[in-house]
Amino acid sequence: MKSVQFCFLFCCWRVICCKSCELTNITITVEKEECRFCMSINATWCAGYCYTRDLVYKDPARPNNQKTCTFKELVYETVKVPGCAHQADSLYTYPVATECHCGKCDSDSTDCTVQGLGPSYCSFSEMKE
């Protein structure tokens, strides 16, 4: 029986430790309206699980802040979008996470919706790799 308990605890520990909030590689789609097409690029962003809870009884004296895996530090990188008209600005600047943590989602700089457009959304039909 002790070996079963140990195995259960080990599996729980493994899930918590391995799926924590951390940097991960993602592919995002960038677009410039002036260029009329999209381009896929690789970037680093935060992904994983954070301990959170949703109270059954809402207490106004105790705010219910859900924690999410989000960036703690980020830098901006710039890529040149090919195929733009000569007068158009062909540079696209995007954020790249360098450090992650579990914290409150900042809606001023992050899409905090339950399901956003997603990193591969493109409003144009033509896609460049």
Curated annotation (Swiss-Prot):
Superkingdom as given in the UniProt entry: Eukaryota
Listed CDD domains: GHB_like (cd00069)
GO terms under biological process: follicle-stimulating hormone signaling pathway; G protein-coupled receptor signaling pathway; positive regulation of steroid biosynthetic process; regulation of signaling receptor activity; transforming growth factor beta receptor signaling pathway
SMART domains reported for this sequence: GHB
Residues bearing carbohydrate: 25, 42
Localization per record: Secreted
PROSITE patterns per UniProt: GLYCO_HORMONE_BETA_1, GLYCO_HORMONE_BETA_2
An example Gene Ontology molecular-function term: follicle-stimulating hormone activity
Pfam short name (any one): Cys_knot
A cellular-component GO term for this protein: cytoplasm
Disulfide bonds: 21-69, 35-84, 38-122, 46-100, 50-102, 105-112
Alphabetical UniProt keywords: Disulfide bond, Glycoprotein, Hormone, Secreted, Signal
Function: Together with the alpha chain CGA constitutes follitropin, the follicle-stimulating hormone, and provides its biological specificity to the hormone heterodimer. Binds FSHR, a G protein-coupled receptor, on target cells to activate downstream signaling pathways. Follitropin is involved in follicle development and spermatogenesis in reproductive organs.
Family to which this protein belongs: Belongs to the glycoprotein hormones subunit beta family.
Name of protein: Follitropin subunit beta
Organism for this UniProt entry: Panthera tigris altaica (Siberian tiger)
Lineage: Eukaryota, Metazoa, Chordata, Craniata, Vertebrata
Gene: FSHB
